[in-house]
A protein has these predicted regions:
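Glycine-centered secondary-structure boundary/capping sites
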Residues: 12, 67-72, 115, 151
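Aromatic-rich carbohydrate-recognition surfaces in CAZymes
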Residues: 1-68, 93-97, 101
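Carbohydrate-binding/catalytic loop surfaces
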Residues: 23-44, 70-91, 141-167
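An acidic intrinsically disordered interaction segment
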Residues: 53-72, 132-147
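A structural signal for alpha-helical segments
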Residues: 41-44, 48, 88, 95, ...
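Catalytic cores of carbohydrate-active enzymes
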Residues: 99-168
């Protein structure tokens, strides 16, 4: 959705939203797998570019927010070094909150233009929630990086790691 919103803004080519594109197929990770490098198969199922973007948005919203209102990061946000912060499903990411709020707020009008008022409202609602949760992550000197699965803050002013993170 991020790149799609950029494309729509720059090109104004709204017809792309209806272009059929195949989905990809890949088996879910097995319990002993943390990641997998592979070439996924193209599915016989296709969907418009808008449908693909909606599925990506729904994936984030299905994971939902953690205890602090931030998106759950699973086994990583943009920073691969954080891949164990949320591996039990409870870790949260401030960066992901900022990014999700930005993308959702930009994608909401796209939903509106597509006549998808319910998804438009849902995107606006979650964008506001994630932005507010990120604001609450201010630690007095910088923003926290996130929270571990056990609820401990990551990158607080009392930590030695993540003190000078570029995104802080």
């Amino acid at each position: 959705p991020y790149v799609l919103c950029e494309y729509l803004e720059q090109r104004g080519d709204w017809g792309i939203l209806e272009e059929p594109v195949p989905y990809l197929e890949s088996p879910p990770l097995r319990p002993e797998e943390r990641e997998r490098y592979e070439q996924p198969e193209r599915s016989r199922e296709t969907g418009g570019v808008y449908d693909h973007a909606c599925r990506a948005v729904e994936q984030v919203l299905r994971r939902g927010a953690g205890e602090h209102g931030l998106p759950r990061m699973g086994t990583g946000d943009w920073n691969d070094g954080m891949d164990r912060v949320g591996e039990q499903g409870r870790g949260e990411s401030v960066w992901l909150a900022w990014f999700a709020a930005h993308v959702l707020s930009r994608f909401a009008p796209v939903c509106g233009r597509m006549g998808d008022a319910q998804r438009e409202e849902r995107c606006r609602d979650w964008a506001g929630r994630f932005a507010a949760a990120a604001d609450r992550a201010w630690d007095g000197a910088w923003f926290l990086r996130g929270y571990y699965d056990d609820g401990r803050p990551l990158g607080s002013r009392g930590d030695e790691e993540c003190q000078l993170d570029y995104i802080a």
